[in-house]
Amino acid sequence: MKYKVEVLSNTIFATNSYLIIDNHNNALIVDPSFDPQAIEQKIDFLGLKVVGILITHSHQDHIFSVQYFMDLYRVDVWASEKSKELLGDRIRNLSFIGSEHFGLEETILDIPVKILEDETTYQIENFIFKAGIYPGHSIGCTIFDFGELMLTGDFIFKGTIGRIDWPGSNPEDMKNSLLLFKERYKEIDMPIFAGHNDATTIQKELKTNIFLLDPKNVKLL
């Protein structure tokens, strides 16, 4: 199946929210961020049926509109166990930054979540993807491998990786996650759509991203 990808970037932290669309106009929302109206307008314009919400990790700029779309479309939310833990933690989900520095309402969520396990394949309607859990930037960081495209959240970006100096970040976990990712995907290539910045590919990052070239010895901080 060929999936289509729509990216919507907000202006606060330049966070990318995504719509993954199948050939029947069903859609998954990935990391609904600070501009729910723009996302909703895109969904309406394209005539999409939302069938689920995926969370790569529970930092505020990736979960701000989860409750809004969960209530609007009456669909399940999918996240790792550790990401679920952070939904209601204003410090480790970084809501305190949004409220103290940008005047944003804090995002404190107590919602049912479908739990994702590492290296496990899931199906939502026609969507089939494998979840991979790679802590470091956040304890519950999850990538979504759709076979023909991948969403990495704030784990891996074009040319770099997610910050590891936030509350709940862990440099040693990040190093281990980079090693694991490199081993799992050393012979696989597909487009990567990250939580910030432009799209890239797995092999481009494995060959040029300094943090993936030699994860054992790279200086993270």
Where are these regions (language model features)?
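Conserved beta-strand hairpin/beta-sheet module of binuclear metal-dependent hydrolase folds
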Residues: M1-L46, I143-G153, F157
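Short acidic-hydrophobic surface loop/beta-edge motif
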Residues: L8, I20, D118-E125
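Short Gly/Pro-enriched turn/cap motifs at secondary-structure boundaries
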Residues: L8-N10, I111-K114, I133-P135
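Residue-level marker for buried hydrophobic side chains located in beta-strands
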Residues: L28-V30, L54, V77, L151, ...
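Active-site HxH/HxHxD metal-binding segment of metal-dependent hydrolases
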Residues: D35-T121, I210-N217
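Metallo-beta-lactamase
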Residues: N93-F96, I128-L220
